[in-house]
Amino acid sequence: FWKTKHINNIFISTPSIIGIVYLILVMNQVFLIDLYLSDYVIIFISYSIIATVFFSMILGHWYLNVIQLPIKLLKNSIILLSFLLIIRLFWNIYALTTFELTDNYGINLSLFSFLWTFEGFLLLVAIFFGLIVPIILNVFIWYTLQIQSTQSATGLIYVSVVSLLFGDLFYKYYAFRFGIIV
């Protein structure tokens, strides 16, 4: 199966299709909640980032086993991931400069000020592991793909998966705990 000389698009596309179906199922549950349109967009972007990094990881594995795959496919998935991370970066900058919340002591704080409190520290961790580290890794992945080293790129994508999952875990904590969708 892995040693085949021909590319079977069904096996490459199936994980993506399953991911899209689950994304639609999750988004249907999210639409039951009364949120602003911008909140729905950033939730969709967040899930899309996770789906894209997993797709890139699976695609990277195919490059390890099927030599004939054009490297352009993996480059395109990394470009898409970079684009989604840039959107999240702009959203986080917007949120940090404009959002306010009330902490446990009843004090209104800007989100940027909240980062430097005891309760807000993990949001800083979420931004670091869920945004800054993946952006830096994407630069490394891109240059690794430029030298046609798909094995190294796949390893870096693995690190990006772990970083994004770790960051997303903390993002979700703040969404549930404080109602902050960042």
PLM segments and residue spans:
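Interfacial loop-to-transmembrane junctions
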Residues: 142-163
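Hydrophobic alpha-helical membrane segments
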Residues: 128-141, 161
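Long, hydrophobic, amphipathic alpha-helical segments used as structural scaffolds
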Residues: 95-98, 152, 174-177
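Juxtamembrane boundary at the C-terminal end of a transmembrane helix
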Residues: 168-182
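Aromatic-anchored segments of alpha-helical transmembrane domains
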Residues: 20-24, 162-169
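Long, contiguous internal "core" modules enriched in hydrophobic/ aromatic residues
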Residues: 1-134
